[in-house]
Amino acid sequence: MADGTVTLRELNRALLERQFLVQRQGITAPEMIERLAGLQAQSPAGPYVGLWTRLDDFGRDVLASATADRSVVKAAWLRGTPHLVTAADYRRHRATLQPVLSAGFHDIAKRRAPGIDVDAVVAAAREHFAEAPRTFAELSAWLTERWPDDDVGAMRHAVRMHLPIVQVPVETGWSYPAKPRFTLADEWLGEPVPVEPANAAAGDEATDDLVRRYLTAFGPAGVTDVQSWSGLPKEDVAAAIERLRPTLATYKEGRTELLGPADVPLPDADTPAPPRFLPEYDNVLLSHRKRTRIVADEHRKQVYLPGLRVAPTVLVDGFVAGTWKVTKAKGGATLEVTPFGRLAKADRAALVDEGERLVRFVEPDAEDHAVRV
């Protein structure tokens, strides 16, 4: 199905709508996480802010309950990075992503420790985690005792990328501390978490599902976009696209083919887009090879920082227009917005209004709250 050329603003508005950044939704936190195919969770507060900006009446207790009842887990996921995902998605797609995780490990191992016996290390670590939840500091000490001549960092990474483990939530803060304990995913969830598909057909079906989910949440997009988001091999993504093609609409951005679900039409390019705050590492900023549909090229260095960090940002008229942070002093909390350029009076007022709610969400116990733009 060919639907013609798509403009930058149409791509922007499609992304905003499919990421629920035009209108907050009245659904549960697990439902939103499922629709987004996971939330980047490198920053402890990130998933909370990401849900706050997308859901009606979202409170910390909502996500805390979902992590406590194990309907949502935090684990290595897309591109090998920590994500919050639904338990159902983790069980279904851990095997789909195992090649991505393995490749991430081998890129490091071939430089630092090519002789590591990965199978032995992972099997031993499984027994170690089966005894009790462990921090990675505890795991490192134990691995060093077992294999004193091997690179402990590489062994630790082998465990993280090959053994299905999830972080154990706590009852304070943002549910997951800076130095969390990990436990076996199958014990936490009460059923096996496979690392290989049952057969080739099951593997293709799962890959198709993941690609379809991406196109629904981030499309229209191309093969290289899916690859950038998931880390899956290009040939696997291309094969999934061909299997899904009868259900997809096809667009052109210049000479590039983009695809999206045929039953999800593009929104109008003039759809109003209210100001929004995004957390660090929000996947909306990381899920396309070419990111101009939301970040202008001249702002890349202010958003994508050294050390692979991604700044918390503000959206104005649908595009990244600045960064933000919360600082505390003398019992008060201030949300500071640093715009990339001059803001219209109405946009500034809307950012202040949104920011006043956000700073109270992030620092509920502060004596005073303020917003500075």
What do these predicted ranges mean?
Residues M1-R291, A296-V373:
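Long, low-complexity intrinsically disordered regions
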